[in-house]
Amino acid sequence: PAEPSEQIADLRRRATDAAADRSTGQIPTAPAPEQADLAVLVTRFQTAGVPVKYSWIGRELPDDKGLQLTLFRIAQEAMTNILRYAPTTRRVEVTVSRHAGTAVLTVDNDAAPGSRPMHGSGKGLIGMRERAAVYGGTVDAGPTSTGWRVRAVLRWDEDDDEGTSPWQMPL
């Protein structure tokens, strides 16, 4: 069997090649996700051989589709960046921690020993930061002692928090 790093590199190639518009080289945007897509997103990466651990701490998010979509898109971009720029990743941890009026998304990846990080244009990080800013939030990204971390904080008025949608909970 292929080594996990080879599988991840192959998945990266297939994902970017298949998604690219041949005329522009751009990857098209997908339609808005349906219910349960954050958990489904993680499952798709796991099925493709990416070693993802997913956890949720706290209550569900409010039933605000924009907030849910923002969290989903930031997670999607962070995980896709792992495929693009860290194909030898040994482990990925996706954690959502829900507090009063705040959700914190953390995506950590551990690089294989001796791997060299690849650098992108930074446009994905800009997009994540712009999405988070709509919800009074922030996105920080940078190296850790073992790999790379993306941390997004989203905020909302707790008085509007109904917390009725369990879409983002792990399956």
Question: What residue spans do the PLM features occupy?
Answer:
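Glycine-rich ATP/GTP-binding catalytic cores of kinases/NTPases
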Residues: 1-171
